[in-house]
Amino acid sequence: MPRDESINKVLIIGSGPIQIGQAAEFDYSGSQACKSLREEGIETVLVNSNPATIQTDMEMADRVYVEPLTPEIVAKIIQKEKPDAVLPTMGGQTGLNVATGLAEMGALEGVRVIGSSIETIRNVEDRDLFDSFMKKLNEPVPAARAVSSVEEALEAVEEIGYPVIVRPAFTLGGTGGGVAHSRDELIEIATRGLEMSFINQVLIDQSVLGWKEFEYEVMRDRNDTCIIVLCNMENIDPMGIHTGESVVVAPAQTLSDEDNQRLRDAAIKIIRALKIEGGCNIQFAVHPETGEYKVIEVNPRVSRSSALASKATGYPIAKIAAKIAVGMTLDEIQNDITKETPASFEPTIDYVVTKIPRWPFDKFKGISREIGVQMKSTGEVMAIGRTLEESLNKAIRSLDIGADGFTETPYTRADLENPTDQRLFQVYTALRDGMSIEEIHGLTQIDPFFLQKISNIAEFESSITRESLEDPRILLKAKRMGFSDSRLASLTGMDESSIRALRLENNIKPVYKMVDTCAAEFEARTPYYYGCYDLEDEVEVSDRRKVLIIGSGPIRIGQGIEFDYCCVHAAMALTEDGYETIMVNNNPETVSTDYDISDKLYFEPLTLEDVLAIIEKEKPEGVVVQFGGQTSINLAVPLAEAGVRILGTPHESIDRVEDRERFTEVLNKLGIPQAPYGIAKSFEDARAVAERIGYPVLVRPSYVLGGRAMEIVYDDVELEEYMREAVRVSPEHPILVDKFLEDAIEVDVDALCDGTDVYIGGIMEHIEEAGVHSGDSACVIPPQSIPEDIIDTIKEYTRKLALELEVVGLINIQYAVKPDSDPSVYILEANPRASRTVPFVSKATGVPLAKMAARLMMGAKLRDLGLTEEKDIEHVAVKESVFPFIKLPGADSVLGPEMKSTGEAMGIDENFGIAYYKSQLSASMDLLNEGKVFISVRDQDKDKIADIVKKADELGFRIMATRGTARAVSDIADIEVVRKVSQGSPNIRDAILDGEVGLIINTPSGKQSADDGYLIRRMAVELGIPYVTTLAGARAALNAIEAVRMGKITVKSLDEYHGM
């Protein structure tokens, strides 16, 4: 049954910016869907607001729209493009919500919804419908009630009994959910949940805390053929911890064959009843003693778990789901890995896969590290091993958190009962301390089987000595359990190179096994490998010219999908140019770990030992470290010292930039100004520097990504507090103390250099003033307020510096501009590698910078690539950052030098105001709210807000302000004075709760985050009220509101903007 001939044009809805609960897995699924449908001759139209995705590259679909993912905007695209069908199931929760919204607006007349019907989405997402649907099937679900008020929640709990799990309907990653053990907790969680559900509904569920959790990925086609992909997955953590927060293993380890059969049958029964055509994820809870099970949830779309199942088996769920959505059947779709089996063969595996989440707690001081029913992790890693112990050890060192294996971590009994992100390490430490498996099981509800595996690792470590490792059998056993050389070195007091030498002397080297979807039953044609210490090696090494690309590992704040984007582009460019490309990475969510992006894929930890072993096996011409963010840059020097050729910019140049004193010498030689600074190894040093250059100063450790431990301090007291904290971050590296340039405009430049010529890819003006981390600030191309002569100076400095550093490939330089001072341009920092703005600049200008950079590294010249004149654009593109505050109770939404954003959205239009408005809408901030504007600013800003107040007044807003702010501008407009929270009721908090306020402008005073400002900002986050914490942001917001009121919002595809 070939594809449905009535479907010739499909609109694919993407998932928008990377956020907690919805990360790179949807770029992977959306990209696969685009490719898959085009293979079938279907015209594809894609809409997504995230510029850092591969799917928004112009060549991925016939037309790509980078527009806000709201039903109103997507309806305009449907009107313009007239697709035959809409595919929402590749866009995560966002895709489903947009599709539901479109249906409610009546915008889907004559357009089919494929993959999952609107009825199916509602049956699964609306809890009452879901429960009654499951009851019709005789499938058990936890007792639950859907409620629309706190009163109803209190009534429901009388029936169900405490503890209850509270979950808002139609949200993502458990946003707003929690476990309530008492009336007070229920009132607090239900209030928050009702605000966050876009249908104002929360579910009060009977608690199945402590039950085991299993997941099944099921595929179904229109012939009703169903298969289970990846047998099943088991969460090591029991119910009560969101599956996205759990350590997950596949195949399941503690499920009996009989129970597996029951859950399999139930999964197939459910997908058939729901009539889903494509992929679906089903989660079950199983009682550890009785084997009783409950259906917890069904996702009628591809998900985080389906990305994991795809990478764990090599079976491309999204690609196959897209073909099924247009009417093809499993038996007609070829398995790309074997090229001879159909997609209806269930994949099987003969290894163990472990997934561990990566959390952002290092970025947010003072917030709870507890994990539970609401997701907090930003990304994840996956590792493959022959045993669970090996797989676990490899996954831990893939996390890139400075741990080369299980490490001793302080714990209390309460920590074991109320898990945090440190859970695995605390369990390991308790076992090492002699606590019994039974006792730990009682506290954690983790199955004794898994505790025994961790105990095996702890026991083996206790037996290792310097002498015992000289026995090759013991060394081989250690390697087979997944111990890294560096871990063995720290356990025995030896150094890593001695362990390596000992290993090589005894010919103990890893071999590589293939991930082939069929446990070696058929021959695989797509080389996708993992390393282990087994006997037979399955890699066929070719004699082609090869390049190895080091990926960027798990998504975390400071190192997001942008770097994966650059790695994929490098692989594509070098493959096009005839090189064999080899990708090394360990992130199951991303496009770079797709089996058909590079010629060979190694799913391995990104450590020196693991990467060197692959290099020794493959013997590439060189290694690319420029694209994988700090993770791959950190490997440049050790790899070069091991004799590996680093392609592109010499690694020596990286040190010339990252070592501050050497960088200053470079700048002095070139005559490029930088802010006064000093280097300090103690508080006394730092105070002396601050006295010499004057407060405020920006303090930070050297060698750091995402501005970690970076702060602006205003006096000695704050400086001393910082030094106590930060010196611990990096003891061997001193602290930098820079003069903070207040009120400067920050500018980012991405450029290409081939060693002789420089091409300026894009100059971005930041909208937030200097002092907000460049990864968090909104920015705009082309610059809107910077005079031409200053732009020329910036270009000149960029050229000089790129040539001096002998850059081959990409360089990113950040400047601070003070137009009225002399000098007017200061350099802040330079990074001779891909930056997080590369995808945005590429989308804004239409020039694929990362691809070009890869070609330059292989010897091409800018002239040959046609890059002589930089590209002027007629439109305006704005990048806005997206923050995780809503997912992290207690986090302050103030922006500063430490990066806090997880992702980005882009707005593009003919004028700045509308482009900025689109960028805000894409970041879930609708500026066109009704309501008053509330303004409260710190003392040093009070004389700078006249124009803001005037503009708000001209736009017809009623303005509220606190007394001090109102006094400063009372002659400009009528201001309603409102009390601070600390001044008694009625106050600003009451006004916000009553829905009077539609926009909040609040600049933070000092560092007391417990102040009124913090409370207001936190309420804005939780209630979804647009807020800005900088004056520049406020000006941009008001200009955007004006532009939208005056003009019409139109949609255009990228190829229309780029005149193609």
UniProtKB/Swiss-Prot annotation:
Domain (MGS-like) ranges: 925-1060
Residues annotated to bind Mg(2+) 2: E297, N299
Residues involved in Mg(2+) 4 binding: E829, N831
Example GO molecular function: metal ion binding
Region of interest (Carbamoyl phosphate synthetic domain), residue spans: 540-926
Protein residues bound to Mn(2+) 1: Q283, E297
Residue numbers spanned by region Allosteric domain: 927-1060
CDD domains: MGS_CPS_II
Gene Ontology biological process: 'de novo' UMP biosynthetic process; glutamine metabolic process; L-arginine biosynthetic process
Co-factor(s): Mg(2+); Mn(2+)
Binding of ATP 2, residues: R700, K739, L741, E746, G771, V772, H773, S774, Q814, E829
Assembly, per entry: Composed of two chains; the small (or glutamine) chain promotes the hydrolysis of glutamine to ammonia, which is used by the large (or ammonia) chain to synthesize carbamoyl phosphate. Tetramer of heterodimers (alpha,beta)4.
Protein name: Carbamoyl phosphate synthase large chain
Gene (UniProt): carB
